[in-house]
């Protein structure tokens, strides 16, 4: 009988090839499993004697990676990278109908005995399941004790409060979500962007009137892992690239003037090319030099056209913030639109939706895109105003009367508590005219009101608003490029020195007509839950009346000596 000997080395080699071909485990899922395991342990065992156990818990790990370059005067000033992981733990005691959540005072109650140490909400940068679980364990313990304290305080306060039969539940019941996003590439050509930043910032040296300037390039990646006792398991990744060109100068009367161009994109390739960046710098220079020579105008009340970006800021400040669901409750809020569902709140030709599911519009990327919000609810298109009639609010998992489910707008920055926030606010109109006709109507309205001119606001830096009940219900916008339109000749002349002010209901109901083309305003919005990326899309607006107040004038002198950068000879010597 002959024995056949099989070669061992080829088998070992084949085995090695099979092993090498096996995909590496997804580190994100490994960490997600660790979070779920620690969550389950706390769900089953966490309970203080003679007190309630949590009825709901969720864990979120938010990992941020950032690269940033800043150049001034042709040189790099900032060359940074940043990487961290932050934890947010939500622990709720009671029930969906009545739990520890409520006004801010409950959030801070329990700051006395037993809470002299607050654990750090950082997560490990290393992919260590045990270290992650340990960090979550410590934060969960602190959050549970605080939740118990808040719950008892809330129950005590209810002894003195009149029962409200229309009081909505404390927390919405949502279906669990399962989603693991494919990893997103995060390239950043450091050398190229350093060169671009240097070259573009160099262009400002030829204009000593612009005494400071900056070119900033950023690349951010946010990875989010979320688990809850309801069964949600979510992994998302988002990237955002930014390029910002800015400069400042002073007018002869001392007023500080600034201008900028800001670009955002979800990919590095989406940022503008070298020529467009150079053109942006040229435009900033030209506009600031023109603003220095422009006359300051007195406060104004009369008709005006708001270009699409400026119109977007108006909708964001005057309408959007007041439709955030969390602002419809609580004694500290003005509740401008509470109880107005089904009623006319805007002109009948205006409709507004907020849609975090839209990545881009007309080729422009939108900052407010996301898959799931910070409470584990899928982002949803929400009709807010339909033909002038209020239909809904932006909703987190904090229910409102008549709105018991979230529509995926619970948003936050870092470790802040999520609240209802805007994402992509999109305004549309059925009363559209072209730009030429819009200007004709502006002139006609100014004549009707006996005004020597109307205004066109073509650019705006942003705005802010007050929604609380402790102050005036007002908003403010900071226009940058304002043009006075002579009613006799139609000639446009640049002016400066004013800010838009107004009350929301009055301002938005003075819209007479809109332009045909929508414009995109990308940026970040700051509120209680931090700074979140947002977009506003709107057409140009013709307002029957707008109020502009005098901006802060400032009487500071410009720098006394010439900048050494602008007075340097070819040999490098300063004159």
PLM features: residue spans?
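Bacterial N-terminal signal peptides that target proteins for export
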Residues: 1-10
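Bacterial N-terminal signal peptides
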Residues: 9-19
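Active-site bordering "gate/hinge" segments
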Residues: 20-377, 381, 386-389, 402, ...
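Long, low-charge, small-residue-enriched segments that form tightly packed helices used
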Residues: 140, 357, 377-575
